Amino acid sequence: MRLFLSLPVLVVVLAMVLEGPAPTQAAPEISSTLGRIPDKLKEFGNTLEDKARAAIESIKQSDIPAKTRNWFSETFHKVKEQLKTAFS
């Protein structure tokens, strides 16, 4: 009984595989793909630019750069004073 049911299923699956891709699933032509590359690159560039601007603006708005600058300045002055006292 199993063999009787599996043979028609196997034939249908084999027919579907051998008929190839449907027209909507077929690969697009190379010329149309190459024609869309500049648009895709421009879209990618614009997206990247927007994200970079947002990241830079976020960094400018935060207080991390000011804290870092102050820490380096204080550390530099401490080292400078220690060197003055050591070599005086």
Curated annotation (Swiss-Prot):
Keyword check for Signal: yes
Keyword DNA-binding: no
InterPro entries per record: ApoC-1_sf, ApoC-I
Gene Ontology molecular function: fatty acid binding; phospholipase inhibitor activity
Alphabetic keyword roster: Lipid transport, Secreted, Signal, Transport, VLDL
Location(s), subcellular: Secreted
Signal peptide: 1-26
Single GO BP term: negative regulation of cholesterol transport
One GO cellular component, as annotated: high-density lipoprotein particle
PANTHER family per record: APOLIPOPROTEIN C-I
Reported function: Inhibitor of lipoprotein binding to the low density lipoprotein (LDL) receptor, LDL receptor-related protein, and very low density lipoprotein (VLDL) receptor. Associates with high density lipoproteins (HDL) and the triacylglycerol-rich lipoproteins in the plasma and makes up about 10% of the protein of the VLDL and 2% of that of HDL. Appears to interfere directly with fatty acid uptake and is also the major plasma inhibitor of cholesteryl ester transfer protein (CETP). Binds free fatty acids and reduces their intracellular esterification.
Family stated for the protein in its record: Belongs to the apolipoprotein C1 family.
Descriptive protein name: Apolipoprotein C-I
Species per Swiss-Prot/TrEMBL record: Leptonychotes weddellii
